[in-house]
Regions:
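Short, structured active-site "lid" loops
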Residues: 81-101
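A short beta-strand-loop structural module common to alpha/beta enzyme folds
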Residues: 64-75
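C-terminal binding/interaction regions
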Residues: 124-180
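Short, Lys/Arg-enriched N-terminal segments with co-localized hydrophobic residues
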Residues: 9, 15-33
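N-terminal beta1-alpha1 ligand-phosphate binding loop
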Residues: 38-54
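Short active-site oxyanion
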Residues: 38-39, 92-95, 114-116
Length: 180
């Protein structure tokens, strides 16, 4: 046996190339097979107008949108709409929640199993919510950000795939068992 060329890799180089290859395969796999079936939207009275603007923008991107309310500016309780959206969420579906600050509605949504709701304020946080945290619900504060920023953040959220890898290990650690 004659070896004409020997290529030596350090441990770190081999690890880098292996991880880079897995990332490319993962992105291709997700890009080919990951399909968003529906995007559920819900808000309280403070988020009603922004929710409607987001609904039209998301429809314009070609997604099927399900508006769970509220349907006017009359005062309602944000937990009711967070719980409603969380109860409808299923695999390959995402959610968009809006209240005055986004804080209360995101806290309420995160009380549900299999909901990872991220309160986002821009495209960067929305993209990383998906890429690093595999968030399936995004929350906005209508009194905190404008429609333009919310729309661009929602688009980034919906178009970004979960990176997996080291982030998958971390996401698995989020779920805690009661009493431990």
């Amino acid at each position: 046996l004659r070896i004409s060329k020997i290529i030596a890799f350090s441990h770190m180089q081999a690890k880098f190339y292996f991880n880079a290859t897995l990332t490319i395969i993962n992105k291709k796999f997700n890009g080919l097979f990951m399909k968003i079936d529906k995007v559920f939207l819900a808000s309280d009275h403070a988020g009603f107008e922004l929710k409607n603007e987001l609904k039209e923008a998301i429809k314009g991107l070609g997604y099927e949108v399900v508006d769970l309310g509220t349907n006017d500016k009359n005062s309602v309780d944000y937990p009711d709409y967070a719980h409603l959206l969380a109860s409808k969420l299923e695999p390959n579906c995402y959610g968009v929640l809006v209240c005055g600050t986004g804080i209360g509605i995101s806290i309420a949504a995160n009380r549900h199993e299999n909901v990872r709701c991220a309160l986002c304020h821009d495209e960067f946080t929305a993209r990383l919510a998906r890429e690093h945290n595999d968030a399936n619900v995004i929350a906005f504060g209508a009194r905190v950000i404008g429609a333009g920023v919310a729309i661009s953040a929602a688009e980034a959220f919906l178009k970004t795939e979960f990176a997996g890898g080291r982030h998958e290990r971390r996401v698995k650690k989020i779920e805690l068992e009661a009493g431990k």
